[in-house]
């Protein structure tokens, strides 16, 4: 009976790890057809931010330049001009299809992330007792570690998150989140987040060392500074 009770929190933790993937898989299969039909039948008004609007305008300017080129080469045989116009027409249709697929992808991922957040929030609230048990296990495990291992682990974690080579990792992670939520890639916003977020984390971490670790385990702070130096 005791083993069964001990297994329940572990099973709950495993379900939390894999639940977002299952939700994403189910939502992508069930919502994609519905969102595609809704987008195509409602003929929704296109909602673009400034960055996406600029990209769309650039594409249409390129097409307009092709049409102007078409007018400049009237001396070409009529058959060649017809093929040229047909090629431009196909490119325009292809661009519209790509744009529609991008908007459907954006709505689908935003809806999936919203549903995942709601389900995980309810699931976590429902299993808060199991989370308390898992938290006690983690605290007991960390308490049994030596101060040297704790200091080394903290140093490794901080170097990964806010170290010299961390901006590239943050750039990849923030870029993935942007793409997952369907946001357009904007280099200035991405660079601003990459340059400021690690600094904020570094400040919070130093405050945590000053306020918490100095009070709980002064020896751990001494070992950490010795390894860091």
UniProtKB/Swiss-Prot annotation:
Cell compartment(s), UniProt: Plastid, Chloroplast inner membrane
Swiss-Prot/TrEMBL catalytic activity: K(+)(in) + H(+)(out) = K(+)(out) + H(+)(in)
TM annotation in the entry: 6-26, 107-127, 189-209
Classification via InterPro entries: CemA
Keywords tagged on the record: Antiport, Chloroplast, Hydrogen ion transport, Ion transport, Membrane, Plastid, Plastid inner membrane, Potassium, Potassium transport, Transmembrane, Transmembrane helix, Transport
Membrane in keyword set: yes
Topology with respect to the bilayer: Multi-pass membrane protein
GO MF entries: antiporter activity; proton transmembrane transporter activity
A biological-process GO annotation: potassium ion transport
GO cellular component: chloroplast inner membrane
Top-level taxonomic group: Eukaryota
UniProt family annotation: Belongs to the CemA family.
Stored PANTHER family: CHLOROPLAST ENVELOPE MEMBRANE PROTEIN, CHLOROPLAST ENVELOPE MEMBRANE PROTEIN-RELATED
Protein purpose: Contributes to K(+)/H(+) antiport activity by supporting proton efflux to control proton extrusion and homeostasis in chloroplasts in a light-dependent manner to modulate photosynthesis. Prevents excessive induction of non-photochemical quenching (NPQ) under continuous-light conditions. Indirectly promotes efficient inorganic carbon uptake into chloroplasts.
Name of the featured protein: Potassium/proton antiporter CemA
Phylogenetic placement of the source organism: Eukaryota, Viridiplantae, Streptophyta, Embryophyta, Tracheophyta
């Amino acid at each position: 009976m005791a083993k069964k009770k001990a297994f329940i929190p572990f099973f709950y933790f495993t379900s939390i790890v894999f639940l977002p993937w299952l939700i994403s898989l189910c939502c992508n299969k069930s919502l994609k057809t519905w969102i595609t039909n809704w987008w195509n039948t409602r003929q929704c008004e296109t909602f673009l931010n400034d960055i996406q609007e600029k990209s769309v305008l650039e594409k249409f300017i390129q097409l307009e330049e092709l049409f102007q080129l078409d007018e400049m080469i009237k001396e070409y045989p009529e058959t060649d001009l017809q093929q040229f116009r047909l090629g431009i027409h196909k490119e325009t249709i292809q661009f519209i299809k790509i744009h529609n697929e991008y908007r459907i992808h954006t709505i689908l991922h935003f809806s999936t992330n919203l549903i995942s957040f709601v389900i995980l929030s309810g699931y976590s609230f429902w299993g808060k007792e199991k989370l308390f048990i898992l938290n006690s296990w983690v605290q007991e495990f960390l308490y049994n570690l030596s101060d040297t291992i704790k200091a080394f682990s903290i140093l490794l974690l901080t170097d990964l998150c806010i170290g010299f080579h961390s901006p590239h990792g943050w750039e990849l992670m923030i870029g993935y989140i942007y793409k997952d939520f369907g946001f357009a890639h904007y280099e200035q916003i991405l660079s601003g987040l990459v340059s400021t977020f690690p600094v904020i984390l570094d400040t919070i971490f130093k405050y945590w060392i000053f306020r918490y670790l100095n009070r709980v385990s002064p020896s751990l702070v001494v070992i950490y500074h010795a390894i860091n130096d």
